[in-house]
Amino acid sequence: MTLEHDRKGISIAVSAEVQAALDAGQPVVALESTVISHGLPYPHNLELALAMEQEVRDQGAVPATVGIVAGVPTVGMDAAAIRRFAHPDPHHPPLKVSRRDIGYVVAAGGDGATTVAATMALAHLAGVQVFATGGIGGVHRGARETWDVSADLTELERTPVLVVCAGAKAILDLPATLEYLETGGVPVLGWRTAEFPAFYSVSSGLPVAYAQDASFVARAWKAHRALGGAGMVLAVPPPVEDAIDRAVVEAAIERALNRAVKEGVHGPAVTPFLLAALARETEGESVRANVALLRQNARIAAQVATAIAGI
């Protein structure tokens, strides 16, 4: 059963479990659906989606997987919807949806897998404060020529959701991404680290503010919001046992970027192309690291959401 919230004639479905938790002031963690439909192949994508939800539950919080299901923005997708996104009709797969695409997919009555930006937007409408993902988008390498900057960054500037991630995706220009976030007034905290993680790698050499535990993150979030701030990033290094050496990742990225240029890949197709190329270059190590950090981020996000609920 879901509860329908009408917003100027547009319905937003919030699962009964999620709504009950929100009403009771209990911790809720949003999860994106792009990782289901545009991440791993079936059945690994389904296994990961369910594992992330279980990581959240194991910490005493309620998971809320976000997506657009048959034209209805949904916060707290049920098992049937998650399975449909994981193994869709090949003729009608879910569209990859950022904030700009939400209205289009709703009007078309289709399925939409939400990116970081769209997940933040819908989670906030439902009242969810914490969101776990793999990595945020950011400023792409070569953005001086292409102007390719992810909508995730502008969403963080305006939408009050705390995003728990492994930093920005490694294929991006990490220094420029941090500069953009600073300009937008978006705090970036490192989970038990003073260095910005580089997604697959533990560190990038770029400094961030140190956060020692969930209680501190919760207090920082409350203060940030009370003083008019919007989004916040909690950057969590990947598990050490699954991390990949930064030099190895950079070499693989350079080769992948050269291939992208030669093959004329551009726009929204760049990120999936590069991630697939990285998986080949690292013989699957990047995929294993991605799965490990996603599960870890879900777990830590639940701890943070619990700490926020306890203040």
Swiss-Prot record:
<feature type="binding site">
    <location>
        <position position="96"/>
    </location>
    <ligand>
        <name>substrate</name>
    </ligand>
</feature>
<comment type="function">
    <text>Catalyzes the reversible cleavage of pseudouridine 5'-phosphate (PsiMP) to ribose 5-phosphate and uracil. Functions biologically in the cleavage direction, as part of a pseudouridine degradation pathway.</text>
</comment>
<protein>
    <recommendedName>
        <fullName>Pseudouridine-5'-phosphate glycosidase</fullName>
        <ecNumber>4.2.1.70</ecNumber>
    </recommendedName>
</protein>
<keyword id="KW-0479">Metal-binding</keyword>
<comment type="subunit">
    <text>Homotrimer.</text>
</comment>
<dbReference type="GO" id="GO:0016798">
    <property type="term" value="F:hydrolase activity, acting on glycosyl bonds"/>
</dbReference>
<dbReference type="InterPro" id="IPR007342">
    <property type="entry name" value="PsuG"/>
</dbReference>
<keyword id="KW-0326">Glycosidase</keyword>
<comment type="similarity">
    <text>Belongs to the pseudouridine-5'-phosphate glycosidase family.</text>
</comment>
<feature type="binding site">
    <location>
        <position position="116"/>
    </location>
    <ligand>
        <name>substrate</name>
    </ligand>
</feature>
<dbReference type="GO" id="GO:0004730">
    <property type="term" value="F:pseudouridylate synthase activity"/>
</dbReference>
<keyword id="KW-0456">Lyase</keyword>
<dbReference type="Pfam" id="PF04227">
    <property type="entry name" value="Indigoidine_A"/>
</dbReference>
<feature type="binding site">
    <location>
        <position position="148"/>
    </location>
    <ligand>
        <name>Mn(2+)</name>
    </ligand>
</feature>
<keyword id="KW-0464">Manganese</keyword>
<feature type="binding site">
    <location>
        <begin position="150"/>
        <end position="152"/>
    </location>
    <ligand>
        <name>substrate</name>
    </ligand>
</feature>
<dbReference type="InterPro" id="IPR022830">
    <property type="entry name" value="Indigdn_synthA-like"/>
</dbReference>
<dbReference type="GO" id="GO:0046872">
    <property type="term" value="F:metal ion binding"/>
</dbReference>
<feature type="active site" description="Nucleophile">
    <location>
        <position position="169"/>
    </location>
</feature>
<keyword id="KW-0378">Hydrolase</keyword>
<dbReference type="GO" id="GO:0005737">
    <property type="term" value="C:cytoplasm"/>
</dbReference>
<feature type="active site" description="Proton donor">
    <location>
        <position position="32"/>
    </location>
</feature>
<dbReference type="GO" id="GO:0046113">
    <property type="term" value="P:nucleobase catabolic process"/>
</dbReference>
